[in-house]
A protein has these predicted regions:
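Conserved residues at the C-terminal ends of beta-strands
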Residues: 261
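Active-site-proximal, substrate-binding regions of enzyme catalytic domains
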Residues: 2-254, 264-312
Length: 312
């Protein structure tokens, strides 16, 4: 019995968010093969990253591993729509799912084949959709240019002594953890206030489950990684990529983690889980932790995860 079979049998069906860089991996194939109940969760950004008007063949090739498991693929709603969901109405992992796109995934793969075989009308439609996806991606990534100002604003919640402590490799003290939570809350409230149309606040119990708060939390962990290393700037193209990495880490906290080969994504996700659980937020178990336990290994500590990001 393989490791994925072992943890699926013990823990039940697993739902794991898949990064673009893991779409064609043997790990994903093993995960889906282990149980017909396991699910590969695809956020909109995963499709957007692969959806390029001039290279639809790469899109088809990128789906080569998951295509035979089309009924195990779950497509999420757009991040903008998810940001408006109120967790008081329905638990977010269920409410996030785009039922229509999920049901149509297998058919989409077949249409992609037909388009690439020369069916002009389908090819045109897919290229138009790809152009739309790239436009949406550009809108989302636009805010990445504000990185230096955002970092300085976040760092201002901590004292010079706090920052020095972090740069010496110290972990967050309880007081610093409280400051972190305050900073994250301030960012989330600011987003609520600046929304183009009014957003409904959830109950205090469900505030940590709202996507805006959860993404602000993961983004705060991302900011901490730069404060700890004394880095005050980020190349625009890297900052744009980081936006997607943090979003994937955020999605992973709603499911059984994120399957990714990216150090930043894994770091932000792991530390965010650790801090959320320290705040009393209940999360589904991370599949990597389940694998480590099944193999008799301890999962990485927050300090070990922090060291993995050096040089990212």
């Amino acid at each position: 019995m393989g490791m994925f079979e072992a943890i699926s049998e013990k823990s039940g069906p697993l739902r794991v968010v898949i990064d673009t860089n893991a779409l064609a991996s043997d790990e994903l194939r093993a995960f889906l093969s282990a149980s017909s109940e396991n699910r590969a969760i695809l956020p909109d950004y995963v499709a957007m990253e692969r959806f390029k008007p001039d290279n639809l063949r790469a899109l088809r090739d990128g789906f080569s591993v998951i295509r035979p498991f089309a009924d195990q693929v779950v497509i999420l709603k757009g991040t903008g729509e998810i940001s408006r969901l109120n967790p008081d109405a329905e638990p977010l992992p269920q409410a996030m799912v785009d039922a229509d796109q999920t049901e149509a995934f297998g058919e989409f793969c077949e249409l992609l084949d037909r388009a690439l075989e020369g069916e002009a009308s389908l090819l045109r439609q897919l290229r138009e959709r790809a152009e739309w996806a790239q436009t949406q991606m550009s809108v989302v990534l636009k805010g990445a240019s504000d990185f230096p100002a955002d970092l300085a604003e976040f760092e201002a919640f901590f004292t010079a002594s706090d920052v020095a402590h972090m740069r010496r490799g110290g972990t967050l003290t309880p007081e610093m953890h409280d400051k972190f939570d305050t900073a994250v809350g301030a960012v989330a409230h600011s987003i609520f206030r600046s929304a183009p149309s009014p957003l409904t606040y959830p109950s205090p119990k469900n505030w940590p489950n709202h996507f805006i708060l959860r993404n602000a939390f993961c983004n705060g962990v991302y900011m901490l990684s730069f404060i700890q290393r004394g880095i005050g700037a980020r190349k625009p193209e890297k900052a744009r990529n980081d936006v997607v990495d943090v979003l994937l880490a955020t999605y992973g906290t709603y499911f059984n983690g994120v399957m990714s080969n990216d150090d930043l994504t894994n770091h932000v996700h792991h530390i965010s889980r650790f801090l959320l659980e320290a705040d009393g937020v209940r999360l589904a178990p991370d599949y990597l932790q389940l694998l480590a336990e099944a193999a008799g290994h301890e999962p990485p500590t927050p300090d070990e995860a922090a060291r993995s990001i050096e040089g990212a």
